[in-house]
């Protein structure tokens, strides 16, 4: 090989790796695992959770879709973002990811904070989307039980939450996450995995993403969504809260989503808490598959 050819090859190799490095650095708000072929589905997990939350869902589809399983930066042991506003960065970078990869007729599936993000993306990108599935999330969670909840991010609240996390060692944080997990998921075989994701998450990211979601009211803004949206709401009777009924859940979610003419709310028929895909997978898959097949 001539000296000139070697120089050209070396230059092209250098440019290739520069391009790869830039592509990887472009999306510092999340990591993504892509598998399968077909219509693209972007899956966004709940707070502190890994994209592996969707492993069984992806396996259920058995290659029918091209799945893009997101893990938000800072969750479940991944490197955190340099700073906030965290959820705005995640939203804008997922939108950029859709545009950069020329994804069309995208199905968005989001759980918890991921559902809030899916709604936010749906407000911006109707032309690129086909359907949205929201798993136990609301456009203004803080306002569900508090009509006076403020539509503003509270730095004081976020710092207070972060301070509580910082004071915990790993064992204490794991115990705290386990307590929360046991309340949010009935499937005991999942408890350690979910609590470990929380323990491994960046404490600042945990505090600020949660407070950013709690401090943002998009109940009116979801009227801008022009693609069909299926909202799946969890319900499991709790004797200590007799006023908490399936009917009360349906009313709360209905009130939250009343501005969205494209939104349909379905409430689980019992023994299903926040991690619907784990507690009631048969109902979850049936509801989602029926909804997505209407797209064909």
Protein language model annotation of sequence segments:
Residues 1-27, 229, 295:
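Bacterial Sec-dependent N-terminal signal peptides
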Residues 34-80:
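Conserved HGGG/HGGXW glycine-rich cap/lid loop of the alpha/beta-hydrolase fold
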Residues 69-109, 113:
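Active-site loop/oxyanion-hole signature of alpha/beta-hydrolase fold enzymes
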Residues 103-146:
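Conserved hydrolase catalytic core segment
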Residues 132-168:
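Flexible "cap/lid" loop of the alpha/beta hydrolase fold
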Residues 149, 165-221:
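Conserved alpha/beta-hydrolase catalytic His-Asp/Glu region
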Residues 229-272:
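Conserved loop-alpha-helix segment in the C-terminal half of the alpha/beta-hydrolase fold
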Residues 268, 272-281, 285:
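Catalytic histidine-centered segment of alpha/beta-hydrolase-like enzymes
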